[in-house]
Amino acid sequence: MAGSGELKLLGVWSSPYAIRVRVVLNLKSLPYEYVEENLGDKSDLLLASNPVHKSVPVLLHAGRPVNESQVIVQYIDEVWPGGAGGRPSVMPSDPYERAVARFWAAYVDDKVRPAWLAILFGSKTEEERAAAVAQAVAALETLEGAFGECSKGKPFFGGDGVGFVDVVLGGYLGWFTAIDKLIGRRLIDPARTPALAAWEERFRATDAAKGVVPDDADKLLEFRQTLLRWSASKAK
């Protein structure tokens, strides 16, 4: 049982990776202290807790740091397993289904993450941005098929409830909203990926995601400009 002060999460409000952890903590109804980090002036606690990558999220459990979002999510699910206290499971109980979920979660970060970064931060020309958008669209079309495989006709990748792949992909949804405004069309297009579009609505509507997954595209795009300025100043 997570007692008062036992769990502390270091994050950034817009980070897809911190969002994943917050969603899972909410799913498990675990009380935690959230500490908003300033990426332009990282705290001593963050630097000491994640000296390798110096990045968020970091989950401090009784003072001990756990790093990297997918690792943190699985850690939470192991320490506070499904069924205990009526908590849901994030990882499937079946070893094969668990392996499949890990495969698709890895696919999201292998394929969606670089496209997301390129669209928002790495594209110097419209041609480069268009290529990154095409990369993201191709990955999402593959995930449309994966949704059918994993969900087995149920509402989420995890079946009846939010699971590992839902959390991993769901962390990006806020920035997808910003990208939609930036490029003038939807990345998760109901005409092209109808199952994913319906899934997005269901995921955003969950109590665990409300107030955690950003929905203000203008605020995100403004923060993007801040990140670009920080990056430019470091390059000088």
Curated annotation (Swiss-Prot):
Residues 94-228 form the GST C-terminal domain. Keywords: Stress response, Transferase. GO terms for cellular component: cytoplasm. Induction: By cold stress. InterPro entries: Glutathione-S-Trfase_C-like, Glutathione-S-Trfase_C_sf, Glutathione_S-Trfase, Glutathione_S-Trfase_N, GST_C_Tau, Omega/Tau-like, Thioredoxin-like_sf. It catalyses: RX + glutathione = an S-substituted glutathione + a halide anion + H(+). GO terms for molecular function: glutathione transferase activity. Expressed in seedling shoots and roots. Belongs to the GST superfamily. Tau family. Conjugation of reduced glutathione to a wide number of exogenous and endogenous hydrophobic electrophiles. This is Probable glutathione S-transferase GSTU6. It comes from Oryza sativa subsp. japonica.
